[in-house]
Amino acid sequence: MVIGLTGGIASGKSTVVDFLISEGYQVIDADKVVRQLQEPGGKLYKAIVETYGLDFIADNGQLNREKLGALVFSDSKEREKLSNLQDEIIRTELYDRRDDLLKKMTDKSVSKNFDSKSQGKNLSVNKPIFMDIPLLIEYNYTGFDEIWLVSLPEKIQLERLMARNKFTEEEAKKRISSQMPLSEKQKVADVILDNFGTIEALKKQIQRELARIEEQK
C-alpha cells in the first residue's frame, strides 16, 4: 500500500513524517530527494546551471536555494519555468525509489535506513509506505491507494510560516498564495489531518488512521 502525504507550506507535514518514521513506517521525502538532486553533480544541479548559468551558485559551489526560491516565488513565469525544468527529473526519481522499496518489501526483505531520517527500525512488509510530496496534487502525482492531507486554517498557517521562516506578513502571504489553497486540496484528499491544535492531537489522528488501515487487512 502506498499513501501520498501532502499539505501546504508550514502545514505541519514534517511533524507527521517524523511521527510516522518513529513508528517504523518508511517515508520517501520529496524535499530531501530534491536536495540530493541539487547537490553539485546532481541531475537538478546540472539542469539549473545549464538554464540559469552560475547566477544561483554560491561561492562554495552549492546551489543558492534561498536566492533561487526568492526568484521563483516572486515571478510566476520563472516559477513555472523552473517547475517544468525540474518536474520530469524529480518525478522519475521519486517513482524509481518507490518501485525499489516496493520490490524490497515484496521480496520480504527487511530494509533499513532507506531514508536518512529513518530511526533504523526494522520495517514490516505489511506496513504501508508513505510518499511526502508537497505538490502532489498540483502536479498530478498518481499511483496512491490513499492521499492524506495535512490541513489547517490559513490564519494559523500564516502565523506559523512567519515564525518559522522569519518572514514578514507580506512575504508569507506571497508564499502561501503561490500554492493551491488547502480548501481545494481537501476536495481531492481521502484523509484530512487537522493540524490546528496540539502535536498530541495530530498524533492521535494519525494513529486512528493507521489503525483503520490495519483493520482493513
Swiss-Prot record:
SUPFAM superfamilies: P-loop containing nucleoside triphosphate hydrolases. InterPro entries: Depp_CoAkinase, P-loop_NTPase. The keyword Kinase applies. One of its GO terms (cellular component) is cytoplasm. ATP binds at A10, S11, G12, K13, S14, T15. Its EC number is 2.7.1.24. Its main location: cytoplasm. Pathway: Cofactor biosynthesis; coenzyme A biosynthesis; CoA from (R)-pantothenate: step 5/5. It is an enzyme of class 2 (transferase). Residues 2-217 form the DPCK domain. Pfam families: CoaE. It is found in: Cytoplasm. GO terms for molecular function: ATP binding; dephospho-CoA kinase activity. It catalyses: 3'-dephospho-CoA + ATP = ADP + CoA + H(+). The keyword Membrane does not apply. GO terms for biological process: coenzyme A biosynthetic process. Keywords: ATP-binding, Coenzyme A biosynthesis, Cytoplasm, Kinase, Nucleotide-binding, Transferase. It comes from the Bacteria. Belongs to the CoaE family. Catalyzes the phosphorylation of the 3'-hydroxyl group of dephosphocoenzyme A to form coenzyme A. HAMAP family: Dephospho_CoA_kinase (MF_00376). NCBIfam families: dephospho-CoA kinase. This is Dephospho-CoA kinase. It comes from Lactococcus lactis subsp. lactis (strain IL1403) (Streptococcus lactis).
